[in-house]
Amino acid sequence: FDEAKFRDTNPNILRNNAKIEDISARMNEALISNNLEALRDLIIECEIVCPVSGSRNWTEVRQFNLMFSTRIGSVSDEAEVIYLRPETAQGIFVNFLNVQKSARLKIPFGIAQTGKAFRNEIVARQFIFRMREFEQMEMQFFVRPGEELKWFEHWKQARFRWHLAMGLGEEKYRFHDHEKLAHYANAAADIEFLFPFGFKELEGIHSRTDFDLSQHQKFSGKKMQYFDPETNESYTPYVIETSIGLDRTFLAVYSSAYCEEKLPDGEERVVLKLPAILAPVQLAVLPLVKKDGLPEMARDIMKELKFEFNCQYDEKDSIGKRYRRQDAIGTPFCITIDHQSLEDNCITIRYRDSMEQERVPVKELGEIVRDKVSMRKALETI
């Protein structure tokens, strides 16, 4: 069976392909000419139904502005219309030469920033996954023209390794390579994460070519070119972009970490199984009782550790209740100082996930915790 020949000669397939091409051409023409009535006629003619309700009762076709507009100026009559930024990237492009010259940077180099972005989403949903005001972490990496696809692959893999190093589980990540590209891109891929509502985009990696710098140069009338001392020529750099949502990352981490467990003794506990490198409190220092010199020893240990680790001191309630409190906020290590600690200078370290306990000398404590909370160590294991 020759499938290609069948597709090229079968009259039904040829007829349907011709119909698809005609519909696509009409839709494209209507979009370009902003003919909303023609778009509605096309919807009715093709008998398009809502995939959820099955209804054909469509509203009129309307324009949606996905950028927020406002006015700037103290006098309303003279106020100028401005738009809130839908991404942080353009601030980097505008300041590209300022940063390059002041920092004396040579290509390839990157500029990264974290900031707010605003999008007038038609439907904001799925908790903090899709919001109208959100935090972005973006990097624009400037490269020589012709080398962009090499660097695109480099950052695609580097960013994936970074996500894996956070310790949420390799099975929760996957790539989605774009077949249809934005007008500014010649390559694009998403890193998707398995949220409670399915795989969704967490980070985008794009090869933006020289589109942004060229557009700024065109409309500002100022050159946005880099002089390369190695090739002795000036050119507009190409750009590789990595763009990740901080709110989505927060959601990914916490939706993966939250757990309600039933223990062998029948009790239940709420535990936040945050990777140690991400835990806001890495170490809890807990004297067994509030007397007999145990708080004093615990505070001395706290003084030694607090400059290197995020620590919390707690002496209120029973040791069991304190363990549960630390489990609930995701503290990976609890250090207990008991009466024997005064004699042998050893403490008990309790591991959050397994609840196992280990007796270790105080002098080895820093090294044990340091290895567990090091991002460098995590990346080395990937």
Where are these regions (language model features)?
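NTP/phosphate- and nucleic-acid-binding module
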Residues: F1-I382
